[in-house]
Amino acid sequence: MAYTSLLSFSVCLLVLFHGCCAQIDLVTNHHQDPPWGQPQQPQPRHQSQCQLQNLNALQPKHRFRSEAGETEFWDQNEDQFQCAGVAFLRHKIQRKGLLLPSFTSAPMLFYVEQGEGIHGAVFPGCPETYQSQSQQNIQDRPQRDQHQKLRRLKEGDVVALPAGVAHWIFNNGRSQLVLVALVDVGNDANQLDENFRKFFLAGSPQGGVVRGGQSRDRNQRQSRTQRGEREEEESQESGGNNVLSGFRDNLLAQAFGIDTRLARKLQNERDNRGAIVRMEHGFEWPEEGQRRQGREEEGEEEREPKWQRRQESQEEGSEEEEREERGRGRRRSGNGLEETFCSMRLKHRTPASSADVFNPRGGRITTVNSFNLPILQYLQLSAERGVLYNNAIYAPHWNMNAHSIVYITRGNGRIQIVSENGEAIFDEQVERGQVITVPQNHAVVKKAGRRGFEWIAFKTNANAKISQIAGRVSIMRGLPVDVLANSFGISREEAMRLKHNRQEVSVFSPRQGSQQ
């Protein structure tokens, strides 16, 4: 009897020990296990030539008009984009416009510059746990539809998308919806070449939208680029089509269990509406009126931020998702399963009240990285939203571990970028709608004009770091005064002023007598 009890106790102890070990291993490794099977450790990016002697602030080169909007692409052959290994685009979606379902071969990060809308992303194998009610009724009965999660978009949102994940966007707001997006074609998740590719599941978009403005014939494209021709309007180009167009209609009909007539409709052979179509019969979420009123009140608070309430509103970016999770009975835990494959958070808001750095006389900086949007750990991307007031300065610094692709969202200002040779490869005024790439380790400084200066910067690292040259947390403060004095050939008193004259952190207020 005693032997049997001892044996049972030993077996229970062994099972408990293995369970604890498994739990510990899960907790210590959950940050390294991407849910869709990517490698455990971030892989090196595709290396590109970065012999940049001169940079230019760029405007979009290719424009493609659709039925309910337009899509613009920056020239991917520009040296600065080749260096960073990225493509850059902008969607302008009219009211009731639908950006057709599509996916890309590389991770994407986009920013809502203007307007509001609805975003849906479909992860393979995840259940359709959400319901919406259609405005169209059949036999006087409302039709309810099950689907995967929908996300509200509003100005200032940053949204992340893994490679190969299909998504769509609908403008249900009262004004135009403008999105700017960076596609990281140099990311290891993209196992094709470093050319932009967009795969549409529906419609018949122009070929240029599918290829990011690039021509099918590389030689033709290079010749056109050398001649300096600007392709502003390409709305009539054909040859895009969707991925279903290439299948035989009878095989497509068998796969979906439909007749061939409907299968041919899926292939959209005569559809010339483009990539953004008008959604005649939209849909609204439950309690739409109450939610709209809440959004309007929230907008009033953001226009007049109360900094003393910052602690209460730090989680604003994810409160909607958290409410939905509580409604379905989910709870966060410390067992390494905080974010499962199907409940992954893709969106982060950047309201004024959640800024990482704030200077009441200078402006604010808000960072979106893997700490506040964990999916970025697997995409190896991050973002920075900057707001500078009249004549304020963003401290001179360099990006330690990432390229920074800067898009100007409001106002104007001056940006200076310096290479390893101590040469200014960019020193110009920039304004809304322009893009400039700051290569890794190149020193940069930004100064706002009289109208202020705002930007969104996409960075090619999940936790991009900067090293400041001036300010309270700069490299100058970390060097001994004698090292500074001898390095620059100045007196100790001058070195002390160099170290301590600026007590602000990253955003500097304008000094009296300073000029643009």
UniProtKB/Swiss-Prot annotation:
GO MF annotations in UniProt: nutrient reservoir activity
Function of the protein: This is a seed storage protein.
Top-rank taxon, per record: Eukaryota
BP-aspect Gene Ontology terms: seed maturation
Subunit comment: Hexamer; each subunit is composed of an acidic and a basic chain derived from a single precursor and linked by a disulfide bond.
InterPro entries cross-referenced by the UniProt entry: 11S_seedstore_CS, 11S_seedstore_pln, Cupin_1, RmlC-like_jellyroll, RmlC_Cupin_sf, Seed_Storage-Functional
Disulfide bonds: C50-C83, C126-C342
Gene field: LEGB
Protein name as annotated: Legumin B
